Structures are given as C-alpha cells and as structure tokens.
C-alpha cells in the first residue's frame, strides 16, 4: 500500500514487519593489498548492483539514494543495476528514490526477483527503457495509494488527508502512464483494486521490457 506512517512502520496491507533474520555471512577475497573481508551486499555494490530487498521506508530510501549517488560519482556513464524483491511501502520514500533514479546520470536497470509490489512496482517501471527486467516467476502488484490513519480527526484534517491522497493518486496514475504502454483511463481503472501481474502480464502492460529466462541476456543490457 502506498501510504505512510508517522512512526515509519509498515504500511503495506497484510504485511508484517520482518522479524529476526539469519546471520548474513561474510567472506574473504584476496586483493593486491592482501585479504579483504566483506559481505554479499558490499560485493554487489562493488559491481554497481543495488539490492532492494526490504520494505520501502525512509531508512531503505536513504540507503538506496546514497548508493545511487556514490555510484554516479564513481562512474557517471556506466549503468547501475537495481535488483528488487520488495512488498512496497511508503509513498514519500518511494518518490524520493524515484526522483533520485531520474536525477543521476547513469541509466538504472531494474530486475525483479520475487515481487515488486505497490511502491516497488513504480520503482521497477522507472528503470531505463529497454532495461527493465523480471524473472519468470516474479510478480508485480499495482494499486491505488492509501494514507495511514485516514478518516480520523476534525473535518478540516480529513479534508487535508483527502486532498493529499487525491494528489498521490494523480501522481501515481501519471507516472504509471509515463512508464507503461497504458492510457490514463486504463491505469485509473486498473489500480482501483489490487492488480497482480505475472512477469508476462507485466511485460504486456509495459511495466517491464523483458522476462529474463537466462542470465546470458543480462550483460548485454549493461554498458
């Protein structure tokens, strides 16, 4: 659910905040300067790969934006790859990442592993044209935004929330039209309820450009 929480908590309907996870292993690599210990995410970052595998919130948005800006400073003409497996989350956190993706010079290739729901679906579609991919069993979910705790407070407060959610929905519709092959009328209808698309359906919808069945086709898309 595209929305927000005053405390940065989970806002995607039915999704619980992740509990304790397994310990991420670290490993050593031999370099010209000796051995270097690092974790898988650091290794991916060295290869200009960003992994969005959590809910989209202020913390994850800050992490993603920082990585985008650093990779741009390292090489502004080389692609960045963003792997996505996310249930979505905060609207404002999503727009912060979205704007940064459009702002940096490198083209952003997006690859969906598992799912890209709600806010994460928008980020998937915002990748560079021709470089938005999904694995065969990935799914993409689009729906209208919602504001947490809406409907409470004085009449003037409710009106403010109503105006804001209308603004959010208008932005979402225009953005999905921009990054898909659908019309505004089609998108308006399609996001009224949860709209779950398979990788093939997302391809037909225009949210991605290719269903990635083999890794052999991936390097050709990266400059």
Curated annotation (Swiss-Prot):
Xref: CDD domains: S14_ClpP_2 (cd07017)
Major enzyme class: hydrolase
InterPro entries: ClpP (IPR001907), ClpP/crotonase-like_dom_sf (IPR029045), ClpP/TepA (IPR023562), ClpP_His_AS (IPR033135), ClpP_Ser_AS (IPR018215)
Membrane-spanning intervals of the chain: none
Assigned EC number: 3.4.21.92
Listed GO biological process terms: protein quality control for misfolded or incompletely synthesized proteins
Gene3D superfamilies, alphabetized: 2-enoyl-CoA Hydratase, Chain A, domain 1 (3.90.226.10)
Gene Ontology molecular function, alphabetical: ATP-dependent peptidase activity; ATPase binding; serine-type endopeptidase activity
GO cellular component annotations of the record: cytoplasm; endopeptidase Clp complex
Chief subcellular location: cytoplasm
Catalysed reactions, as listed in the record: Hydrolysis of proteins to small peptides in the presence of ATP and magnesium. alpha-casein is the usual test substrate. In the absence of ATP, only oligopeptides shorter than five residues are hydrolyzed (such as succinyl-Leu-Tyr-|-NHMec, and Leu-Tyr-Leu-|-Tyr-Trp, in which cleavage of the -Tyr-|-Leu- and -Tyr-|-Trp bonds also occurs)
Protein's UniProt keywords contain Transit peptide: no
Active site, renumbered: 118 (nucleophile), 143
Known partners and oligomeric status: Fourteen ClpP subunits assemble into 2 heptameric rings which stack back to back to give a disk-like structure with a central cavity, resembling the structure of eukaryotic proteasomes.
Function: Cleaves peptides in various proteins in a process that requires ATP hydrolysis. Has a chymotrypsin-like activity. Plays a major role in the degradation of misfolded proteins.
Name of protein: ATP-dependent Clp protease proteolytic subunit 2
Species of origin: Leifsonia xyli subsp. xyli (strain CTCB07)
Gene (UniProt): clpP2
């Amino acid at each position: 659910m595209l929305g927000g929480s005053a405390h940065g908590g989970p806002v995607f309907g039915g999704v619980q905040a992740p509990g304790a996870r397994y310990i991420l292993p670290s490993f050593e690599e031999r370099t010209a300067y000796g051995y270097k210990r690092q974790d898988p995410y650091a290794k991916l970052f060295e290869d200009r790969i960003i992994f969005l595998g959590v809910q989209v919130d202020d913390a994850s948005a800050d992490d993603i934006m920082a990585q985008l800006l650093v990779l741009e400073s390292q090489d502004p003409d080389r692609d960045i790859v963003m792997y996505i497996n996310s249930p979505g989350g905060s609207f404002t956190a999503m727009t912060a990442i979205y704007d940064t993706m459009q702002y940096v010079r490198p083209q952003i290739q997006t690859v969906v592993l598992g799912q890209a729901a709600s806010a994460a679906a928008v980020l998937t579609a915002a990748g560079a044209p021709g470089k938005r991919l999904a694995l065969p069993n990935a799914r993409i979910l689009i729906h209208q935004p919602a504001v947490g705790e809406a409907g409470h407070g004085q009449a003037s407060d409710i009106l403010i929330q109503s105006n804001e959610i209308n603004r959010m929905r208008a932005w979402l519709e225009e953005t999905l039209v921009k990054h898909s092959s659908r019309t505004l009328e089609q998108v308006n209808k399609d996001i009224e309820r949860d709209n779950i698309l398979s990788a093939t359906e997302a391809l037909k919808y225009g949210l991605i450009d290719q269903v990635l069945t083999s890794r052999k086709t991936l390097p050709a898309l990266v400059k």
